[in-house]
Amino acid sequence: EKENQKQHPEEYKMQMDGQAVFKFAVRQVPAVIKEVLEKNNLSLEEIDWIILHQANRRIVEAVSRYLNVPLEKFPMNMQEYGNTSSASIPILLDEMNRNQRLKKGQKIVLAGFGAGLTWGASVLEW
């Protein structure tokens, strides 16, 4: 095994196809957002914030365009912290709360995607 690692080190490194992840996220995230809203009898117009995994700005902008929802409803902080993996949504939610951007009764969609091309979404009322 160790000898194989020396001969073929590329097989033992983490790799990511950024273009494939972008295409995946832009296709799956809007679909799962629509699905979670439908299951909760809500429309996009009733949602105050859509908080996505903070992978990169291009994905957030593309999801905003695809859903035809103003980018202002998609808070972002990746410019401050980068991609913090599974912590990105909780960090942004906490930051918004500390900055008093979240108000009682607001409806929020949380949508994540990541390793292994997994994805999911939930709706909460603040």
Regions found by a protein language model. Give the residues of each.
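Hydrophobic pocket-lining "lid/loop/helix" segments that shape and contact the acyl-thioester
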Residues: E1-M78
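Buried hydrophobic packing segments
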Residues: V32-I33, I89-M96
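Active-site-adjacent helical/loop segments in soluble small-molecule enzymes
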Residues: N77-I89
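Conserved beta-strand-centric core segments of catalytic alpha/beta enzyme folds
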Residues: L93-W126
